[in-house]
Structures are given as structure tokens and as C-alpha cells.
A protein has these predicted regions:
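Condensing-enzyme catalytic core mediating Claisen C-C bond formation in acyl metabolism
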Residues: 1-72, 172-235, 239-242, 318, ...
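Conserved beta-ketoacyl condensing-enzyme motif
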Residues: 4, 52-58, 63-133, 247-267, ...
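Short beta-strand segments
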Residues: 8, 102, 132, 156-162, ...
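Short, well-ordered amphipathic alpha-helical segments that serve as non-catalytic structural scaffolds
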Residues: 30, 74-89, 232-248, 296-303
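A contiguous, well-structured pocket-lining segment that forms one wall/lid of small-molecule binding clefts
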Residues: 69, 222-285
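Claisen-condensing/thiolase-fold acyl-transfer catalytic domains that form or cleave C-C bonds
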Residues: 79, 105-107, 119-124, 133-153, ...
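Flexible, glycine-rich active-site loops centered on histidine and acidic residues
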Residues: 152-181
Length: 332
């Protein structure tokens, strides 16, 4: 049985609220619009408020240099999340035999984020590698480990990290500044020891013909075909919930659900389309923004203390690629 033994997450240090982005940075769409259309109150950045105010992040390469000087990078966020996951699992870094990492906004082309995180945490030699499926990377990591279950070392550390604000355009007519936050999540996974969550195999797939619908150029800003991606995400997430429910014989109204933390409003659309109760839907986007692949696992880390043994969680996520994934977790 594959299980998650420890969960951790870490957010960047500098808070950006809606009033600051509208009144000082000058984003044209005001807080009322953000509340009704996105449902996001605040997010966190590896950058400084002064930098965003003065430059609008016109040159993402300058943002990367600033983040490095401030000591906050996708790797440092991932390492912070990893430390929390290791502590909850009650194991030492030296016991980890494999690190699998996702990083949507790497500051280094090479080496892998997995090796940089391993070095930061004091993890020894192993077949550490990056497995990137953008926002759906948590599902991809769980699927990969389920496929490899018999060959896994005793403890695996998975991390999902990104600093999207370094690739965000804060020009006045762009709403991306309201959406993105920086953060990371981590999970200690084992196929030999029971933990906090039982992991059932995930389903993952992609739509290559839509590969450029969500894109970050090597040294450019994030951009996407917003309306098309939103419509696809709502439709596909509903399909994925249904697929998992059918596979495992579940009534979706009796389980917990969690979706990609893209926006509060998008998740409401999904719940309304399927007639699912909001009280059994887990989310945190309103208080930290969209932190990409770390979104769902950070929700799990925050929600687990209020869940009880036997509770089941169906998760589904759609992201760049276009890539998607879904699966089932059970509280142990």
C-alpha cells in the first residue's frame, strides 16, 4: 500500500493584498471585481512590494536576480516544505532514498530541482529527478509512485514548487497579478509503512494540441488563453471526478473533493455543475492565491487535522500541457 506519511507546505514571505495591487500598483480591475470573479483575497511573493510597485516586473530576469538576493527561490520554498513533511513523518533527511520534484519556474535550467532540494535538506545520493506536469504534477507524482511501488526505496520525498510572481506581468490591464502566489508543498511517501493518507492509483493524461494554451517563455511572462482554458478546466475536472467515483464505487456527495486552486469562483462553477456540497469541498486559494502544483497538496496539509479516519478525498486538477490528473486518497 502506498501512503503519505508527512505533508508540508511553505509560502513566500511578502504578502500582496488586493488593495495594494489596485491602489498602489495600479491594476485596473478593482477589489470588488477580484472578490466576485476570482475570490482571492491575498497571495504571497518572493519579490518585494517596492520592486513590483516600481517596475511592474517588466523584466522577469530582474525578478529572478532579486529573489535570489532575498534568499527566496522555488528551491528554498521546496526545501522549507520538505522539512515540514519530514518532521511530520518523523524521519530524517538521510533516510530518503528518492526525491521527485516539480518546478514550473526554475531559476536554473540545470541541475534538477530535485538535486538542489536534496542538497538543501542533506539528503544523500539517489536517483533524484524532476517530473514536471505543471499544475497537475502532484497527481503525476502519485501515479508514478504507484506504478513503481514494488521498486521504491523505503521513503520518497515529492515536492511541488513555483514562484509565478517572478513571471507575472503587473501592467494595469493584466489580471494575472491577482491570481498568482508563490509557494511549495511536499509529501513523504512510503510503500512499506502506513501513514496519514492511503494513495490509490491516479489517472493522468494530456492534450498536446493545446500545448501552448498556457505558456511561460524561457525569459518571459506567463500567458494563457484564459477563457478557453477556464472552460476546459471546468469540463475536465467534472469528468475526472466522475471517473474516479466510477472506478472506486463512490458517491461524490459523500466524499470530500479538492480541485486545482486556480480561483474560488472556478471551483464554485464546478461544484454547481455537479450539484456537490460546498461544505465538503476543500480549498485555500482565497488566502494564498494560485500556487500551481502546490495548491492541492497544500490544501491537504491544511485540512488533514479536521478530517477523520476513513474519510475519502477525490482530487482532480487541470493545468498547462494541457495536462490533467485525478485520484483518490483515504485518511488512515
Amino acid at each position: 500500500m502506498l501512503s503519505i506519511m508527512g505533508l508540508g507546505f511553505e509560502l513566500a514571505q511578502t504578502e500582496l493584498d488586493n488593495d495594494f495591487l489596485h491602489r498602489e500598483v495600479g491594476l485596473a480591475l478593482g477589489p470588488d471585481w477580484v472578490k466576485s470573479r476570482l475570490g482571492i483575497n491575498k497571495r504571497f511573493t518572493v519579490l518585494s512590494r517596492d520592486y513590483i510597485l516600481q517596475t511592474k516586473n517588466a523584466q522577469p530576469n530582474e525578478a529572478i536576480l532579486l529573489a535570489r538576493r532575498r534568499g527566496q527561490t522555488p528551491v528554498s520554498l521546496a526545501a522549507g516544505a520538505g522539512r515540514r513533511a519530514l518532521a511530520q513523518a518523523g524521519i530524517k533527511a538521510q533516510q530518503v532514498g528518492l526525491v521527485i520534484a516539480n518546478n514550473d519556474t526554475p531559476f536554473e535550467t540545470i541541475p534538477s530541482t530535485a538535486n538542489l532540494v536534496a542538497r538543501s535538506l542533506g539528503i544523500g545520493s539517489g536517483p533524484h529527478c524532476d517530473v514536471n506536469a505543471s499544475c497537475s504534477s502532484f497527481a503525476r507524482h502519485m501515479q508514478l509512485l504507484a506504478d513503481m511501488e514494488g521498486a521504491l526505496p523505503e521513503f520518497v520525498l515529492c515536492v511541488q514548487t513555483a514562484a509565478y510572481t517572478t513571471r507575472t506581468d503587473y501592467a494595469s490591464r493584466c489580471m494575472d497579478g491577482y491570481i498568482w502566489g508563490d509557494g511549495a508543498a511536499a509529501q513523504v511517501v512510503s510503500a512499506r509503512r502506513a501513514g496519514l493518507l492511503k494513495v490509490s492509483p491516479a489517472v493522468c493524461a494530456t492534450k498536446p494540441e493545446a500545448a501552448e494554451d498556457v505558456l511561460i517563455d524561457a525569459a518571459g511572462h506567463f500567458r494563457q488563453k484564459g477563457a478557453a482554458v477556464k472552460a476546459f478546466s471546468i469540463q475536465k475536472t467534472g469528468e475526472l471526478y466522475g471517473l474516479v467515483a466510477q472506478r472506486y464505487g463512490l458517491d461524490l456527495k459523500s466524499v470530500y473533493t479538492v480541485a486545482h486552486q486556480a480561483s474560488h469562483a472556478l471551483q464554485n462553477n464546478i461544484l454547481q455543475n455537479l450539484g456537490l456540497p460546498e461544505c465538503r469541498h476543500l480549498r485555500n486559494v482565497q488566502e494564498q492565491g494560485n500556487i500551481a502544483a502546490a495548491g492541492i497538496p497544500s490544501v491537504l496539509a491544511q485540512s488533514l487535522p479536521r478530517l477523520k479516519t476513513g474519510d475519502r478525498i477525490v482530487y482532480a486538477v487541470v493545468g498547462s500541457g494541457l495536462a490533467w490528473g485525478a485520484g483518490l486518497l483515504e485518511v488512515l
